[in-house]
Amino acid sequence: MDVKEQTRKAYELFGKGDMETFFNDMIDDNIVWTFPGKEGVHPLSGVHKGKQAMMAAMSKIPAIWPNFHLKILDMISEGNKVFVRVHATADNMDTMFGHYFESSVEGKTKVMMTFDDTLSMFNAMKK
């Protein structure tokens, strides 16, 4: 499976809510997920090191952004790297995100950096 296929499968699992398979099959134990911004300002901001930290951060999404969905628009890849342009929707949110990934030799995501529309996310947050 090449990095585009791997990435597409990860988005499918995330979209179906199959987080067990998503984390077990697609995410490296030592993943580093960077969500730019000062930690604590945005609910997802910071550098999340390891699968458990990523799970804890992602578990906030359904309560803060009800009906959160991502749809891949397109992808570009080079070697073990892929960048995805995503249509992101939730209650009161309709925007675009960019997501960068690097895969391990084992075919799991080891690096993730999100370039999300934080203003739209803040405006849509359920408080």
Placement of each model-derived feature along the sequence:
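C-terminal and inter-domain tail/linker signature
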Residues: M1-K127
